[in-house]
Amino acid sequence: MSELSTEELIAQKQSWLTQDVSNLKVDIVFSDMDETFLHTDKSLDAKNMEMLDRLAELGIPFAPCSGRAFNVLPKEVVNHPASKYVVSCDGAIIRDLSTQTVLHESTVTKEQALELYQKLKDYPVTFDIFADGGVYLERSRHNLISQLGIPAEHAAFMQRSRTPFDQSVEEFIDSVTTIERLGSYWSVAEGEKYQALVADAVASVKGLSGTASMSMGMEILAEGTSKGAALQWLCNYLGLSTENAAAFGDSLNDVAMLSAAGMGTAVANARREDFEAAAYITLTNDEAGFSRFLTWALGE
């Protein structure tokens, strides 16, 4: 932990804003989506999309790197010519977009999912199943989303992106091929209580670990899975140095990725932990911080 105040840390890691020349070499770019590449209201930023155009022109591969399931990622980003790979479900799946094949996976077993469900089923929390590229939820828990006190924009996104099912969880889990990760959200008003209960339940299932992108939810992964591990795996697969990787993020689930990348860059709306892990801090997600840093890094 730095002894600097948050304001001092930001000032130190934004000093690049006053420098004309970067002398950096960017070979690949990774970015979180929500609260980082996207506006807070989940809309696309025109400057960030223009930067993807520039990356495509330069032949620099871009990899959206998100806690979202593949089918829930912004289509305009996934289908952009710059996007060559996708890291979805916090690093559980790495996909090559040119061939639509999964290059690497680090997934949750059906047995682990069922064991965790048994521990959480009596709590008023969601039990989100990220499987086969989609997100699924018991209908009764889907109806719970609107009652949790989650910010309206995010609650609406959750409802849109999750497909309710009417069969039992056991039957549903049996019907899918691959469980990429799990997730659980709880009431904002009782956040501390349920955060502790869910964290304890996750810790009691061998081979699972939890990370968070919001204070009222937990993203549940196979142990050892992270965006950072995925970044390192993909750079190694492509024969690229992580020193020449730029990565952007804002949440706890981005810390490992920002640490792993030579040009780990936190948006100014990120958490203190991201500021600590990053080499650089850029502008906020609503100020096209992604584009602003890369404009400088690429010497544009």
Task: Specify the residue positions occupied by each region the protein language model found.
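Active-site phosphate-binding/coordination module
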Residues: 43-151
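Asp-based phosphoryl-transfer active-site loop
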Residues: 25-41, 116, 258
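Active-site metal-binding loops of divalent metal-dependent hydrolases
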Residues: 33, 68, 91, 249-251
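Conserved acidic, metal-coordinating active-site core of Asp-based
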Residues: 119, 123, 130-248
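Short, acidic loop-to-helix structural element flanking the phosphoryl-transfer center
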Residues: 42-58, 105-112, 165-169, 222-236, ...
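Short, structured coil segments at secondary-structure junctions
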Residues: 80-82, 89-90, 98, 204-206, ...
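Non-catalytic pre-domain segments flanking phosphatase-related domains
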Residues: 1-31, 50
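Mg2+-dependent phosphoryl-transfer enzymes with acidic/Ser/Thr/Gly-rich catalytic loops
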Residues: 6, 19-28, 44-45, 218-300
